[in-house]
């Protein structure tokens, strides 16, 4: 992978990570349109560390309070009912489904889920679902209404993001609004919930950088730094946007992009596996999996 490719893919990662339009799906699509090999699971996972660092900095006060109160509550029963202490447990509980599913279905995620037709269909289907929930759900709950059961349901929706095109933020925000949470509350918890899974996935995939993956160490570092810088600006804008707007612009975009991809595949402009393989210098290897 060239530095220019890394910059472009880092830009795509940063622009799409926090929007409900699927960053992994867009990385897959951009590679197909550009004629590049699929950037691979390791690049996708590690570059997401950059965007999650942006979340960590943007929500640093929330994260600091949650960590401090949660640790103190381990030895202080009176603190265990505090919202920050409970939030720590809810994030842990909500992270279990995607961790288990990611390990159990790693092989299935590797190849079949990279098919452009599936990416297009998930963009459309989950876009329609997001639109319906956003328009018709009764959004009245705040984060103080979160409990262990709702935290687990959030986690089950996040698990769907293992399929490119679903969108981690889109799936979890949809699940949150379906349970009655307001847009800002649903998004805030979705971003906090993503941190353990994304950091764990990125660290787990670090070992694959520079091996048979298309992206080398230098390109991955560049892409991650670009994703961090762009991601911070996007999350700041996105939280302001949803305070006064609905998710419908993203819904229309998802549906339009999904239809476009299906049309291009149908007419033979793209193949379902476009950009899915990377010919290494020593041998041909299949570019692997999705994380977001």
Swiss-Prot record:
<keyword id="KW-0133">Cell shape</keyword>
<feature type="transmembrane region" description="Helical">
    <location>
        <begin position="113"/>
        <end position="133"/>
    </location>
</feature>
<comment type="function">
    <text>Catalyzes the dephosphorylation of undecaprenyl diphosphate (UPP). Confers resistance to bacitracin.</text>
</comment>
<feature type="transmembrane region" description="Helical">
    <location>
        <begin position="250"/>
        <end position="270"/>
    </location>
</feature>
<keyword id="KW-0573">Peptidoglycan synthesis</keyword>
<dbReference type="Pfam" id="PF02673">
    <property type="entry name" value="BacA"/>
</dbReference>
<protein>
    <recommendedName>
        <fullName>Undecaprenyl-diphosphatase</fullName>
        <ecNumber>3.6.1.27</ecNumber>
    </recommendedName>
</protein>
<dbReference type="GO" id="GO:0009252">
    <property type="term" value="P:peptidoglycan biosynthetic process"/>
</dbReference>
<keyword id="KW-1133">Transmembrane helix</keyword>
<dbReference type="GO" id="GO:0071555">
    <property type="term" value="P:cell wall organization"/>
</dbReference>
<feature type="transmembrane region" description="Helical">
    <location>
        <begin position="190"/>
        <end position="210"/>
    </location>
</feature>
<feature type="transmembrane region" description="Helical">
    <location>
        <begin position="219"/>
        <end position="239"/>
    </location>
</feature>
<keyword id="KW-0961">Cell wall biogenesis/degradation</keyword>
<dbReference type="GO" id="GO:0008360">
    <property type="term" value="P:regulation of cell shape"/>
</dbReference>
<feature type="transmembrane region" description="Helical">
    <location>
        <begin position="87"/>
        <end position="107"/>
    </location>
</feature>
<keyword id="KW-0812">Transmembrane</keyword>
<dbReference type="GO" id="GO:0005886">
    <property type="term" value="C:plasma membrane"/>
</dbReference>
<dbReference type="GO" id="GO:0046677">
    <property type="term" value="P:response to antibiotic"/>
</dbReference>
<dbReference type="InterPro" id="IPR003824">
    <property type="entry name" value="UppP"/>
</dbReference>
<keyword id="KW-1003">Cell membrane</keyword>
<keyword id="KW-0046">Antibiotic resistance</keyword>
<keyword id="KW-0472">Membrane</keyword>
<comment type="similarity">
    <text>Belongs to the UppP family.</text>
</comment>
<keyword id="KW-0378">Hydrolase</keyword>
<dbReference type="GO" id="GO:0050380">
    <property type="term" value="F:undecaprenyl-diphosphatase activity"/>
</dbReference>
């Amino acid at each position: 992978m060239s530095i220019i490719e890394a910059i472009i893919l880092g830009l795509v990662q940063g622009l799409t990570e926090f929007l409900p339009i699927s960053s992994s799906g867009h990385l897959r699509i951009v590679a197909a349109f550009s004629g590049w090999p699929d950037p691979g699971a390791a690049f996708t996972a590690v570059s997401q560390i950059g965007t999650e660092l942006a979340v960590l900095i943007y929500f640093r006060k929330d994260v600091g309070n949650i960590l401090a109160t949660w640790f103190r509550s381990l030895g202080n029963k009176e603190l265990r009912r505090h919202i920050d202490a409970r939030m720590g447990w809810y994030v842990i509980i909500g992270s279990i489904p995607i961790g288990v599913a990611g390990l159990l279905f790693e092989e299935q995620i590797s190849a079949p889920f990279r098919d452009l037709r599936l990416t297009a269909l998930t963009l459309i289907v989950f876009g329609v679902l997001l639109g319906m929930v956003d328009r018709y759900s009764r959004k009245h709950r705040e984060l103080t209404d979160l409990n262990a059961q709702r935290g687990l349901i959030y986690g089950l929706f996040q698990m769907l993001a293992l399929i490119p095109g679903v969108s981690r933020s889109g799936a979890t925000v949809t699940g949150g609004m379906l349970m009655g949470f307001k847009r800002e509350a649903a998004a805030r918890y979705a971003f906090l919930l993503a941190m353990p899974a994304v950091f764990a996935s990125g660290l787990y995939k670090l070992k694959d950088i520079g091996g048979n993956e298309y992206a080398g160490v230098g390109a991955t570092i560049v892409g991650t730094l670009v994703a961090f810088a762009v991601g911070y600006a996007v999350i700041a804008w996105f939280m302001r946007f949803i305070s006064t707007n609905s998710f419908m612009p993203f819904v229309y975009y998802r549906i339009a992009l999904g239809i476009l991809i299906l049309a291009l595949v149908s007419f033979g402009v793209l193949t379902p596996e476009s950009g899915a393989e990377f010919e290494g210098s020593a041998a041909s290897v299949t570019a692997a999996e999705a994380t977001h």
